[in-house]
């Protein structure tokens, strides 16, 4: 049974899964409004894994960097997707798809195409620590296309900065 004080994802009304669509609409005017209305020439998204509202809210006044966002930008509390895992959220930002569409729910899962447990973000078998060692083409089991490619088709240049 789900505890009554659990917070459920608000898909379509304030969930992490709504972030890509919100950015798409703000930059291109295409699609539904999303989390925040308005059109913009530039949008900057800082995606800091595991730094949710319960960490941000009590620190926002203490750190100038966070306070700047509060005063000069847009800060909004949203719900996590389900499951609330790095794999699901990173894949959502890369593809624009929630877990139910991308198929990436967890850090590790059984993949029938290779008949083993894989680590999709590392593209490796469960017992391997070597990135890219999975012996199947990603196109066979992962979503194709990226959120950034969709933006490019709409004439929007986008950039991603992340660890290699």
Label every PLM stretch briefly.
Residues 45-46, 160:
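Structural beta-sheet core signal
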């Amino acid at each position: 049974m789900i505890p009554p004080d659990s917070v459920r994802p608000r898909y379509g009304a304030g969930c992490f899964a709504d972030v890509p669509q919100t950015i798409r609409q703000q930059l291109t005017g295409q699609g539904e409004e999303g989390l925040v209305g308005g059109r913009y020439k530039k949008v900057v998204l800082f995606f800091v894994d595991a730094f949710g509202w319960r960490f941000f809210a009590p620190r926002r006044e203490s750190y100038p960097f966070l306070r700047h966002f509060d005063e000069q930008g847009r800060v909004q509390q949203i719900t996590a997707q389900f499951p609330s895992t790095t794999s699901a959220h990173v894949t959502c930002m890369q593809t624009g798809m929630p877990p139910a569409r991308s198929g990436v729910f967890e850090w590790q899962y059984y993949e029938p195409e290779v008949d083993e447990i894989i680590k999709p973000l590392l593209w490796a078998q469960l017992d391997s620590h070597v990135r890219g060692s999975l012996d199947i083409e990603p196109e066979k089991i992962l979503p194709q296309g990226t959120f950034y490619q969709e933006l490019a088709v709409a004439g929007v240049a986008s950039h991603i900065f992340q660890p290699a």
